[in-house]
Amino acid sequence: MRSKFKDEHPFEKRKAEAERIRQKYADRIPVICEKVEKSDIATIDKKKYLVPSDLTVGQFVYVIRKRIKLSPEKAIFIFVDEVLPPTAALMSSIYEEHKDEDGFLYITYSGENTFGNFETA
């Protein structure tokens, strides 16, 4: 899936920003969170997040739910490289496994399980 953030910002600028963030906030992970293109779920108000490295995927999903004001009965799925990461996984381990060459971790979200793949821990 194409990232709008990548389309809007050149690689060198993204890489420099991620490096600056990692130097200044060593215990935080730079995350870009974008909606899956054809999903009918609400669009998030901001794409860039500085996530504590000890946050779990489940806790991050909670943050996203709050940002898009998603009601409790509605489902949300987040994907890293088109795969659903384990809810209990730490964001730091997801970052180490899936960070982009520019230094950001790219996460997409959707109201439906559009890809259908689960990552097993």
Swiss-Prot record:
Give the site residues for Cleavage: G116, N117
User: Cross-referenced Pfam families, in alphabetical order?
Assistant: ATG8
Q: Does the keyword Repressor apply?
A: no
Q: Name one GO cellular component term.
A: cytoplasmic vesicle
Subcellular location(s): the record lists: Cytoplasmic vesicle, Autophagosome membrane; Vacuole membrane
Record membrane topology: Lipid-anchor
Proregion span(s)? 117-121
Q: SUPFAM superfamilies, per this entry?
A: Ubiquitin-like
A Gene Ontology BP annotation from the UniProt entry: protein transport
Superkingdom field:
Eukaryota
Q: How is it modified after translation?
A: The C-terminal 5 residues are removed by ATG4 to expose Gly-116 at the C-terminus. The c-terminal Gly is then amidated with phosphatidylethanolamine by an activating system similar to that for ubiquitin.
Q: Where is the lipid attached (Phosphatidylethanolamine amidated glycine)?
A: G116
Q: What does this protein do?
A: Ubiquitin-like modifier involved in autophagosome formation. With ATG4, mediates the delivery of the autophagosomes to the vacuole via the microtubule cytoskeleton. Required for selective autophagic degradation of the nucleus (nucleophagy) as well as for mitophagy which contributes to regulate mitochondrial quantity and quality by eliminating the mitochondria to a basal level to fulfill cellular energy requirements and preventing excess ROS production. Participates also in membrane fusion events that take place in the early secretory pathway.
What family does this chain come from, according to its entry?
Belongs to the ATG8 family.
The protein in question is named: Autophagy-related protein 8
Annotated organism of origin: Chaetomium globosum (strain ATCC 6205 / CBS 148.51 / DSM 1962 / NBRC 6347 / NRRL 1970) (Soil fungus)
Q: Which gene encodes it?
A: ATG8
